Amino acid sequence: VSARFKFFIQTLVAVLVISLSYYFNKDFGVYKIVIPFSGVMDFKLPLALSFAISYFAFTGTVNAVNLTDGLDGLAGKQVLVILSFILTLLYAASFASLSFDISDLRIIIFCFLGSILAFLFYNTNPAKIFMGDGGSMMLGSLVAFIFIMLKLELMLIFIGFIILMEA
């Protein structure tokens, strides 16, 4: 499959995910910055800029995870750490401002954590199975989807720092 076709499919999926986020999140484009000892500061970006940030976060994450998948289990381990952090964040923080049920998101994360652990068991040196483009793009799409639905696209820079640096 050519790179242009892959990017076209990524664009279609990104537009679908961002449209769903716009539909389900009542405050699409409103970002919160937590300032220690001061509280929470809200700022609203224009819709086009918020859409662009979400689009680049999605396509960037998908391609970064795809490029990271070069060695035995490298992308799987990185996504395992990111999903574990998101799960810890969901349990530790209160996301009362979200307009959808977070328990569904937790179930999805637990399912993917289990599948990544099973994959890593068979992907140790010498690897018996490989993730390939389909698996790495799916994991990148999952991470981007979760961050977009939680309105944490800007935090993706810090949490996915290793993946972004390798890309």
Tell what function each PLM region has:
Residues 1-165:
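"…together with the soluble PPM/PP2C metallo-phosphatase catalytic core" -> "…together
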